[in-house]
Amino acid sequence: MKHTVVSEWQSGMHFVADSVGGNAILDADEEVGGKGLGKRPKPLMLVSLAGCTGMDVVSLLKKMRVEVDDFRVEVNGELTDEHPKTYHTVKVDYYFGGEEVASSKDKIEKAVNLSVDKYCGVYEMFRQFATITFEIHYL
C-alpha cells in the first residue's frame, strides 16, 4: 500500500495538504513567520498516533463485545532542545469510562496491548525514534 500527500504552499508558512480522507491546513506560529491559520506539523504526528491506536482499540473492543461510554486517548510528546527538534519521549494515556468498564478491564487491557504491540503502525514508527510508554486509566 502506498500513501501520497500533496502539500501546497498558500502564503507565508501556510500550506494545505491533500491526503486520503480530506485536507489538512498547516501553518506556523507567528514568531516563526506563520499566522496561526492551521495545525503545526509535529503535533499532527501525535494526532496520528492517538487516532491510529484509538481506532485499533475501538475496533478490538467491538470484536470483544465490550461497550464503553467514554473513551479518549491523550498523547504528550517532549521535543529535544536542539535542531532538528524531534520527539524523544512520548506518553500515551488511555481513558475509559462506563458501566461495563469495571467488569471488562482484562479485555480493555488486552485491546490496548494488541494495538501497542501488534496493530498500530504509527506506534511502531514512534518506537524507531522515541521512548514511548502508555498507561490505562479508568474513570
For each predicted feature, which ranges?
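Extended beta-strand/beta-hairpin segments
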Residues: 1-47, 58-139
